[in-house]
Amino acid sequence: MPEDKVEAIEHVESSRHDATVNEKAIADFLNAEKEMTTWQAVRAHRRLLLFAAYRVTHLAILPFVCASNYGYDTVSNGSSIAMPAFIMSFGAMNHATGSMYLPSIWTSLWTSMTNLGQALGSLIAGFLAERIGRRWTAVSLAILSIVGTFILVFSSTRGMLLVGKTMNGAVVGGLMAIGTTYAADVAPIKLRGALLQAIVFFGVAMQGVSLGIVRAFILDMRPLAWKIVFGIQWAFATLVLIAAFLVPESPVFYVAHGKHDKAQSALRRLHGSSDQYLHIRYGAIVHALDEERKQQSESVSWAELFKGCNLKRTITIGFIMFSTSAIGVPFLTQNIYFLITVGLNVTSVFDIGIGGFFLGCLFVMLGWLSNEGIGRRRLWLWGLIGNFLCMVTIGALGFSTTKASQLAIAVIMNVLISYGVYATVGVAWTICPEISSHRLRQYSQSVAFIVGAVGGWLFNFITPYMYNVDSGNLGAKTGFVYAGLTVVVAVISWFLVPETAGLSVEDIDRAYEMGTAPRHFKSAKATVSAESGH
């Protein structure tokens, strides 16, 4: 049985009629691919997954470099404000205590404008990617990153720093929209989840590296310390440029623009397989886009996201991305500053945080082995349950002021970050590209990151007002607020979030068009397959 499935993928026969593929051949191909286990898919697509091979760079390097850029920027942007050298350069003097501090208005602006920059970058990336392609959009963003990083490194005023942070925020928002779209475009069904999870892995790994670099310079009082932290982003911009010139353009983009010869050439570079296999996969893309066009107008526009069954898809994607902030991710990402305010030693806080990020990498690798079996929807709901329990525990520990309680809060917050990478944030980054239709995927992903960035801006802005002593003064009891919001998200998710694991684009399209309840997507697909004889 396993050998038969692999053979079906590697040597499936095509029915050629003037370079066309009939629907039965496509259906047989997709069903053979969906029925494979993850290990069988790895064997069948081993060229894509051998990292030392030239062809795998085509599939993986662009999304992974985009994720690495995102991971490094998000943490360096937030944790650098805790560096004494940074505070000495951009802080103000508290004459009553004789100490330096960062004015609240500027810390809020740096955080919020970075998030809004991400939203703007996602919007622009969606517009450009549908006109000039995924690759050239990535090149444009990399050039913008070089300029933005230059402004950061040579900033002499808070306003100049704000401009640089906003520009780089736009870069990372756009790159993540491009990276996830590209991965979803080119990945085989059974490897789609693993590759999207790998994007999460690279992002989390770079967050840990970023925190480690900040930790290495935390006691360095020279301005050069924070300049180095920001300047490293030049390396990531260069990697994006290299990756963009190594990879082929998305074959989905080429087919959507009628460039069929280029689409087949891109598929050959990506998969390097037999003519029969490439002909079937090319036919599957053409068929999927044709079916979507039958339901919609020929031209692709932002307005289509809010029409018919696409509206429910857009609402679902936006809800999932917004929820990652609503359940407390901003509270967790501010844990370094928060834990310092409750009395923990600054180096201890950084060390625990670094350990937490690399624990997150282990959780992501666990996801590679288990996500297809567990399913996206079930894992998302489990993640919300775990988030609720941890937030309640953090809130309860807020009633104690002992050192042991403070350490327990630090450990739980970092474990929850790692668990969230696996079960909530990781699932969000995986499922949102899958919910999108082929034609609207880039637009959908841009909307996803716009909504996610707005949610991040909102909760990053209000969270300090919850726990700071000069406002809400909740301290760790802020966990109760996010526990309550998690319950709300879980209830809505039960009715709105679908299961997409193992489903093709056609399966998901059909489920939305038929008005199938999201929680029944998997069973509805099985029923349709049984009735059609596949």
Curated annotation (Swiss-Prot):
Listed GO molecular functions?
carbohydrate:proton symporter activity
Q: Does the keyword Kinase apply?
A: no
Instruction: Using the UniProt record, give the first listed, main subcellular location.
Output: membrane
Example GO CC term: the record gives: membrane
Question: Which keywords appear in this protein's UniProt record, sorted alphabetically?
Answer: Cytoplasmic vesicle, Membrane, Transmembrane, Transmembrane helix
Give the phenotype of cells or organisms lacking this gene. Seems not to affect fumiquinazolines production.
Compartment(s): Cytoplasmic vesicle membrane
Q: What is known about its induction?
A: Expression is positively regulated by brlA, a conidiation-specific transcription factor involved in the early stage of asexual development and necessary for conidiophore formation.
Q: How does it sit in the membrane?
A: Multi-pass membrane protein
Which Pfam families does this entry report, sorted A to Z? Sugar_tr
Q: Which residues cross the membrane?
A: 48-68, 109-129, 136-156, 169-189, 194-214, 228-248, 326-346, 349-369, 379-399, 407-427, 447-467, 478-498
Q: Domain of life of the organism in this record?
A: Eukaryota
Whether Nucleotidyltransferase counts among this entry's keywords is no
Q: Which GO terms describe its biological process?
A: carbohydrate transport; fumiquinazoline C biosynthetic process
The record's function comment reads: MFS transporter; part of the gene cluster that mediates the biosynthesis of the antitumor cytotoxic peptidyl alkaloids fumiquinazolines that confer a dual-usage capability to defend against phagocytes in the environment and animal hosts. Probably involved in fumiquinazolines metabolism and transport.
Q: Which family does it belong to?
A: Belongs to the major facilitator superfamily. Sugar transporter (TC 2.A.1.1) family.
Please identify the protein, giving its name as recorded: MFS transporter fmqE
Q: Which organism is it from?
A: Aspergillus fumigatus (strain ATCC MYA-4609 / CBS 101355 / FGSC A1100 / Af293) (Neosartorya fumigata)
> Upper lineage ranks?
Eukaryota, Fungi, Dikarya, Ascomycota, Pezizomycotina
